[in-house]
A protein has these predicted regions:
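Structural signature of the two symmetry-related core transmembrane helices
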Residues: 101-116, 196
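Helix-loop boundary and gating motifs at the non-cytosolic
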Residues: 36-75
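Intracellular juxtamembrane helix-capping segments at the cytosolic ends
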Residues: 139-153
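C-terminal membrane-cytosol helix-exit motif in multi-pass small-molecule transporters
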Residues: 1-17, 205-210
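A membrane-interface helix-boundary motif in multi-pass transporters
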Residues: 1, 181-199
Length: 224
């Protein structure tokens, strides 16, 4: 069973090591890539803080608009069906789109769905918005552990991938509390704007720092 089931592809390990060498280049850059990983982890907190709103306050928001609760429940069925159908299609993007680009675009689409909630008043609008959210989820979430593995050394990849799961739990724990507090002090519209700003703000920091690191890496390569 071990021989047949748990074979490890040596070529895959070699390929992953080459990708890591491309990212790190030297020990000098390694600590900077780790800073980027922490920016990604912080962004992941904001993503799941926002996602948890759909599991908590959004049910109340939709029923307050006269939409029956069963319709809210059906949105999660739609989410599951779309992921089952769409995830294999998204995976086919990998030969054509850089992983970091795919994840950044996916998180932005995910964040955009919360901004569009400001204008949602009917069940159709909520369905369209949830489809947009699911597209962002499919495009970004599955690739994050692989991106973390590219940005870290082999001996520390598991540590940071574990932190990714911890940050997800932190975001889900904070989300309902944050949502209830903002709604009590403000409104649902302000809540949607605030989580959009949290996600896009940290995403912009990731993009700027990633651009800076690529510039530094190119300069170091030219100096060799």
């Amino acid at each position: 069973v071990v021989v047949l089931t748990f074979n490890v592809a040596v070529d895959a390990i070699k390929e992953n090591s080459e990708i890591q060498e491309h990212y790190h280049g030297s020990h000098e850059l390694h600590s900077r890539w780790i800073i980027l990983v922490w920016f990604i982890l912080i962004n992941y907190i904001t993503v799941h803080l926002s996602y948890s709103l759909w599991e908590s306050v959004m049910a109340v928001h939709m029923t307050n608009m006269g939409i029956p609760f069963y319709a809210y429940s059906m949105l999660w069925t739609l989410n599951g069906v779309l992921i089952i159908i769409g995830q294999p299609l998204v995976n086919k993007l990998s030969p054509y789109v850089r992983l970091s680009t795919q994840i950044i675009v996916g998180i932005f689409i995910f964040a955009l769905s919360f901004l569009l909630l400001i204008f949602a008043r009917t069940l159709t609008a909520f369905v369209i918005d949830f489809v947009i959210l699911t597209i962002g989820e499919m495009t970004s979430f599955a690739g994050l552990p692989a991106w973390i593995a590219q940005l870290t050394n082999v001996d520390e990849a598991g540590h940071y991938q574990g932190l990714l799961n911890i940050m997800m739990s932190v975001g889900r724990a904070i989300g309902p509390l944050y949502g209830g507090f903002v709604i009590e002090k403000g409104s649902y519209q302000f809540l949607f704007i605030s989580v959009f700003c949290l996600m896009t703000g940290t995403l912009i920091i990731i993009c700027l720092y990633l651009w800076h690191l690529h510039r530094v890496q190119r300069r170091l390569n030219l100096d060799k």
